[in-house]
Regions:
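C-terminal catalytic/acceptor-binding lobe
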Residues: 196-265
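Long, low-complexity Q/N-rich tracts
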Residues: 94-115
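Conserved catalytic core of nucleotide-sugar-dependent glycosyltransferases
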Residues: 128-212
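Short, well-formed alpha-helical segments that are part of the catalytic scaffolds
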Residues: 13-25
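Short beta-strand-to-loop acidic/aromatic patch adjacent to the donor-nucleotide binding site
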Residues: 117-128
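Short internal beta-strands
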Residues: 29-34
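N-proximal low-complexity "stem/linker" segments adjacent to membrane-targeting elements
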Residues: 1-16
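Active-site-proximal specificity loops/subdomain of glycosyltransferases
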Residues: 36-93, 117
Length: 265
């Protein structure tokens, strides 16, 4: 298996997170929603191990990468849409020749026809983990799963519950949901996302999108909820002792980036 990748999804990059990720051996991509500044030109010299990706909204709309976090941020095209657009079109083991169109403000030399297999961590910037070793341990423990996420992967039985009434899915159920603020996907999951976007010219809310499309493939794709991701939740007030006790988990949400620094001491 080729080296796994990390995609940090943010509106604007934060120097503390960039400093942290710049030391990693993973291939790290910073997916930036804001297009007011060329961040590659601004940061590439200082953070030479990071790849800064910016994509125009119109390109996402053209390829059907919309609605992924409209419920959360009230935008048709968000950083999540841009992340999935970039990785699904460039890294999903297809013959799609879209790489030259999706490399906007990046130093990445991406081959969309890659034959190597790897997984990608998609992480929002209010997600905390202690070190690169946290991800390496999870990768070593669960090498063969297509989707790792905090979900029980049980089909929804009441579409009047949760957010189902606000989510439009164009394939037949069953449907699934979970917390997807930090999740690891294989290229096969990315390909399922690309196929849906191409077919229906839109996607749907990420907390239903990833588990539903993965489970839709029946036995072809494998999903798992590791204990290490059960601390990725909608809302929780974490304290320092939580991380002292368990440095193997990934945590969400911790929105104050200065707390990330404190919690890593």
């Amino acid at each position: 298996m080729s080296k796994n990748k990390i995609a940090l999804i943010c509106f604007k990059p934060n120097n503390i997170y960039l400093e942290f990720l710049n030391k990693f051996n993973y291939e790290v991509y910073i997916i930036i929603d804001d297009n007011s500044v060329n961040y590659n030109a601004l940061y590439q010299t200082k953070y030479s191990n990071l790849k800064f990706i910016q994509i125009q909204e119109e390109l996402c709309k053209r390829y059907g990468f919309t609605n992924v976090n409209k419920i959360g941020v009230k935008k048709l095209v968000s950083g999540w849409d841009k992340a999935l657009c970039y990785f699904s079109l460039n890294f999903s083991n297809t013959n799609s020749n879209t790489n030259s169109n999706t490399n906007s403000n990046t130093n990445s030399n991406t081959n969309s026809n890659t034959n190597s297999n790897f997984n990608t961590w998609f992480i929002e910037d209010d997600v905390f983990f202690h070190s690169e070793d946290t991800l390496l341990k999870i990768d070593a423990k669960y090498p063969d799963y297509d989707l790792l996420a905090n979900s029980d992967f049980s089909p929804a039985t009441n579409m009047n519950e949760w957010l189902w009434s606000s989510i439009k899915i164009k394939t037949k159920g069953p449907y699934y949901c979970g917390m997807m603020c930090a999740t690891r996907m294989s290229q096969r999951v990315l390909n399922s996302i690309r196929v849906y976007a191409t077919t229906y010219n839109e996607l749907f809310f990420l907390e239903a999108l990833f588990p539903t499309l993965t489970k839709e493939a029946n036995l072809e794709l494998k999903c798992c909820c590791p204990d290490e991701l059960k601390t990725v939740v909608y809302r929780h007030n974490y304290v320092y002792q939580d991380f002292v006790k368990n440095k193997d988990n990934i945590y969400h949400p911790i929105k104050n980036i200065l707390e990330h620094v404190e919690f890593r001491k």
